[in-house]
């Protein structure tokens, strides 16, 4: 009877070592060798201090900064350990109330802006951690940021254009703006 189990146990051991030890070690070392910055989280540093990751959104509540997409990672915004969507359907009263509240907050921050609010400023992404907004969402906020920083609108609009990333590989997704990079560039203008 034990002879019937030997091959199965041996295969279990072999595949456990291959898929549980050798493959992860190989991929980790290849990642560190070929893509060290990305393998370590695409961190953005200044003077040896980590400011954030270009892959994870961050909360910016100060109206002098561009704001990112809302985070769905309650109770703490942009918590990678709680990454998920809100799972609220389009007719869910809680989602509709949250959207209305977010629209009102945007209107309160910039009362003179009567343009339609871009959808990505009031809805969370699928992961709840998206670091990007659309160029339209950045353009919507540009006048507020320029006014509160005493900058001319063309200067801020030019910065948005410079930090707008194209479609991935030229055809995947939509153009996007990394909010952290854009806000750091704003701070560098001082």
Swiss-Prot record:
It comes from Methylococcus capsulatus (strain ATCC 33009 / NCIMB 11132 / Bath). It is a single-pass membrane protein. Part of the high-affinity ATP-driven potassium transport (or Kdp) system, which catalyzes the hydrolysis of ATP coupled with the electrogenic transport of potassium into the cytoplasm. This subunit acts as a catalytic chaperone that increases the ATP-binding affinity of the ATP-hydrolyzing subunit KdpB by the formation of a transient KdpB/KdpC/ATP ternary complex. This is Potassium-transporting ATPase KdpC subunit. The system is composed of three essential subunits: KdpA, KdpB and KdpC. Its main location: membrane. The lineage of its organism: Bacteria, Pseudomonadati, Pseudomonadota, Gammaproteobacteria, Methylococcales. The chain crosses the membrane at residues 7-27. One of its GO terms (molecular function) is P-type potassium transmembrane transporter activity. Belongs to the KdpC family.
């Amino acid at each position: 009877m034990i002879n019937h189990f030997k091959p199965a146990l041996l295969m279990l051991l072999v595949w456990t070592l291959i898929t549980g030890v050798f493959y992860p070690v190989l991929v980790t070392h290849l990642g560190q060798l070929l893509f060290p910055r990305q393998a370590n989280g695409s961190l953005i540093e200044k003077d040896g201090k980590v400011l954030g990751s270009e892959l994870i959104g961050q909360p910016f509540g100060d109206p002098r900064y561009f704001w990112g997409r809302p985070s769905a990672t309650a109770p703490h915004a942009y918590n990678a350990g709680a990454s998920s969507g809100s799972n609220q359907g389009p007719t869910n009263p809680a989602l509709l109330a949250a959207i209305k509240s977010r629209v009102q907050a945007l209107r309160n921050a910039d009362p003179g802006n009567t343009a339609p609010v871009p959808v990505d400023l009031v809805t969370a992404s699928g992961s709840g951690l998206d670091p990007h907004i659309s160029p339209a969402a950045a353009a919507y906020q540009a006048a507020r940021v320029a006014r509160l920083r005493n900058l001319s609108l063309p200067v801020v609009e030019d910065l948005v254009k410079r930090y707008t990333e194209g479609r991935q590989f030229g055809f995947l997704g939509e153009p996007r703006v990394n909010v952290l990079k854009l806000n750091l560039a704003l701070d560098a203008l001082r």
